[in-house]
From Swiss-Prot:
KW Translocase (keyword) present: no
Name of the protein this chain belongs to: Nucleoid occlusion protein
Pfam (any one): HTH_ParB
InterPro entries: Chromosome_partition/occlusion, HTH_ParB/Spo0J, Nucleoid_occlusion_protein, ParB/RepB/Spo0J, ParB/Sulfiredoxin_dom, ParB/Sulfiredoxin_sf
DNA-binding region residue numbers: 153-172
Keywords assigned by UniProt, alphabetized: Cell cycle, Cell division, Cytoplasm, DNA-binding, Septation
Function of the molecule: Effects nucleoid occlusion by binding relatively nonspecifically to DNA and preventing the assembly of the division machinery in the vicinity of the nucleoid, especially under conditions that disturb the cell cycle. It helps to coordinate cell division and chromosome segregation by preventing the formation of the Z ring through the nucleoid, which would cause chromosome breakage.
GO cellular component, one term: nucleoid
GO MF, one example: DNA binding
Compartments where located: Cytoplasm, Nucleoid
Organism: Bacillus cereus (strain ZK / E33L)
PANTHER family in UniProt: CHROMOSOME-PARTITIONING PROTEIN PARB-RELATED, NUCLEOID OCCLUSION PROTEIN
GO annotation, biological process: chromosome segregation; division septum assembly; positive regulation of sporulation resulting in formation of a cellular spore
């Protein structure tokens, strides 16, 4: 299937190196080798828009061994931004592997792209490889939105992804730096990180992060812990309490006052108070006729 990212993001034919599927092998070889140049490694700088922030040294070492055995099959892609100064558009892992091998020059295809095009190609090229961490992917989506003034829905349509996928990734960017770093270092999974979002309180989020790492909580255990914290944070409803006095003297005086009020009304009320070990007893006699 032909790569459609160039058309979708308005690059025209500037990413044609990614769209060679419809050409014959002879045409491909002729076209590619005409454009390849050997560029001194010291004149090449990484892409400032590179979404990948963590490079696995072991994977770079493996790639270097493969290149040493089979050569660099796919040249890197660069743009020239000053005389004899080049910026990588695609292929930073290959560039790092060649540097590790001690190469002085590296085969490269030079493309004439502006800043926006360079950033977009670098971001898209990395997104297609599916090796980015969740945070790196979120950063790539955010940069594409800003570069092309897109909504989340529009970006999702252009990338062939669900809008919820884009939204869920972007929510991760609101988490504290410590949690984003844990994602980058793969100390926690994306689902762990997403579970922390409802807590809102940064102090609580970091507290649970520490528990996840130290106790090696799985996602279900993390969600249960967070649910408990959210329940504890809810304001407690105060139960209505009847005013009950445990002071027997107040109770006795209240009864006596009531009896006096009845007597003052003209009724001849007889009352008798008795005290026992466990209780007081008041016997009241009210005549049926006045």
């Amino acid at each position: 299937m032909k790569n459609t990212f160039s058309r979708l993001f308005g690059f025209g034919d500037k990413e044609s190196e990614f769209e060679l599927q419809d050409e014959s092998h002879e045409e491909i070889d002729k076209k590619v080798y005409e454009e390849i140049q050997e560029i001194p490694i010291v004149n090449i700088t990484p892409n400032r828009y590179q979404p990948r922030t963590v490079f696995d040294d072991a994977r770079i070492e493996e790639l270097a061994l493969t290149i040493r055995t089979h050569g660099l099959i796919q040249p890197i892609v660069v743009r020239q931004y000053e005389d004899d100064k080049y910026e990588i558009i695609a292929g930073e892992r290959r560039f790092r592997a060649a540097t590790k091998l001690g190469w002085e020059k590296v085969p490269a295809i030079i493309k004439n792209l502006n800043d926006t095009e360079t950033a977009s190609v670098a971001l898209i090229e990395n997104l297609q490889r599916e090796e980015l961490t969740a945070i790196e992917e979120a950063v790539a989506y955010q940069k594409l939105i800003e570069l092309h003034n897109l909504t989340q829905e529009a970006l999702a349509q252009r990338l062939g992804k669900g809008q919820s996928t884009i939204a869920n990734k972007l929510r991760l960017l609101k988490l504290p730096e410590e949690i984003k770093n844990a994602l980058l270092e793969k100390s926690i999974t994306e689902r762990h990180a997403r579970a922390l979002i409802p807590l809102k309180n940064e102090e609580l989020q970091l507290k649970v992060l520490q528990e996840i790492v130290e106790k090696q909580l799985n996602v279900k255990q993390t969600e249960e812990r967070i649910t408990k914290l959210l329940e504890e944070a809810k304001p407690k409803r105060k139960a209505k309490q009847k005013a009950v006095s445990r002071d027997t003297r107040i109770a006795m005086n209240t009864i006596r006052q009531s009896l006096q009020m009845v007597a003052d009304s003209g009724l001849n009320v007889n009352s008798e108070e008795e005290e026992f070990d466990e209780y007081y007893q008041i016997t009241i006699q009210i005549p049926k006729k006045k």
